[in-house]
A protein has these predicted regions:
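A short LG(V/I)-centered, amphipathic sequence patch enriched
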Residues: 41-60
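Flexible hinge/capping segments at coil-to-helix
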Residues: 154-189, 193
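Short beta-strand->loop
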Residues: 155-165, 237, 246-259, 269
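Hydrophobic hinge/microswitch elements
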Residues: 129-133, 138-142, 147-148, 190, ...
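Alpha-helical linker/hinge and terminal dimerization helices associated
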Residues: 43-46, 67-88, 280, 284, ...
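Central regulatory/effector-binding core of bacterial HTH transcription factors
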Residues: 91-152, 216-218
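Secondary-structure junction motif
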Residues: 174-178, 186-208, 273-282, 287-297
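Short helix-boundary/capping micro-motifs
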Residues: 13-34
Length: 298
């Protein structure tokens, strides 16, 4: 019997994810020497090294790689048990993920409404791209995520639909907007790889990236580049009130049928928090409709 402790498994998981003792120790809220000691003790129990210590990084051994996948599954199961117990108590903690093209525009009102509805709720927000949120959700590191649907493999509740609008330099405001099929030839500025909004914009204008594409990490950067006359971009309706006033740009609706996306909340199909999450969905839905979202039909 190895007699592994849950604490050791969590420390191992942190080091496997960060590949750096300092960052892993910070994530675990312990000192680096304490983390090193726990990892050393874990390796002694296995009778072999799980990590290769290098000057500036950590590499995993073959056993370490094999163990990492299983430890992630174990910790997710433990978190499910913790959630099962929590489901029989008032909701006290929520680890909520959100994509960057939603967070700045929706979260302020969502957080206010959550605080009003659940005064004792401790909310931890994680903002990152869809792929990372899906990974962390599957591993049990977050409880739910607000994303653009669809995202396969999870329980999903559509919350609202919002249009994509064309943003172009203010000097072009009087010109008719280009047809969607002509955006492929325009100087369409895009978010960098990994953002679902990039994929959605490419889907609107065709399957291939447009010429002279510029990759940014935020909608704010895209809008500023448009204001400087470097191209055009698409932004979701909820972002207009914040972003369009920060640069000399014009915002135009496309002719029907307008391109759009559906925002929803996802969680694990086995999550014991399904009932309170459905209640929270209604809070997010109302906040979305307040910033221009349209309730899903049916």
């Amino acid at each position: 019997m190895l007699h592994l402790t849950l604490r050791q498994l969590r420390y191992f998981d942190a080091l496997a994810r960060h590949r750096h003792f300092g960052r892993a120790a910070g994530a675990c809220a312990i000192s680096q020497p304490a983390l090193s000691e726990q990892i050393k003790e874990l390796e002694e129990k296995f009778g072999t090294a799980l990590f290769e210590r290098c000057a500036r990084q950590v590499r995993m051994t073959g056993l370490g790689e094999a163990l990492a996948e299983r430890v992630g599954t174990i910790l997710a199961a433990v978190d499910e048990l913790d959630g099962l117990a929590a489901s029989h108590r008032p909701l006290r903690r929520l680890r909520l993920g959100v994509i960057p093209t939603v967070g700045p525009y929706l979260l302020p009102s969502v957080m206010q409404d959550l605080t009003a509805a659940y005064p004792d709720l401790d909310v931890h927000v994680r903002e990152t791209i869809t792929g990372r949120l899906a990974e962390e959700l599957g591993q049990g590191r977050i409880d739910a995520a607000i994303v653009a649907l669809p995202v396969a493999g999870f329980e999903a509740t559509p919350l609202f639909t919002e249009e994509f609008l064309l943003v172009r330099p203010r000097a072009e405001a009087a010109a008719p907007p280009p047809a969607l099929e002509n955006l492929r030839a325009a100087r369409l500025l895009l978010l960098e790889e990994g953002h679902c909004l990039r994929d959605q914009a490419l889907s609107v204008c065709g399957q291939n990236p447009p010429r002279e594409a510029f990759a940014a990490s935020s909608l704010s950067t895209l809008v500023q580049m448009v204001g400087a006359g470097l191209g055009v971009t698409l932004i979701p309706a909820m972002a207009v009130a914040v972003e369009a006033r920060s640069a000399p740009v014009a915002v135009t609706r496309f002719a029907a049928p307008q391109p759009s996306r559906t925002i929803g909340m996802i969680w694990r199909k086995t999550s014991p928090l399904a009932k309170p999450l459905r209640e929270i969905c209604e809070i997010v839905r109302r906040a979305g409709e307040a910033v221009g979202g349209i309730a899903p039909r049916g």
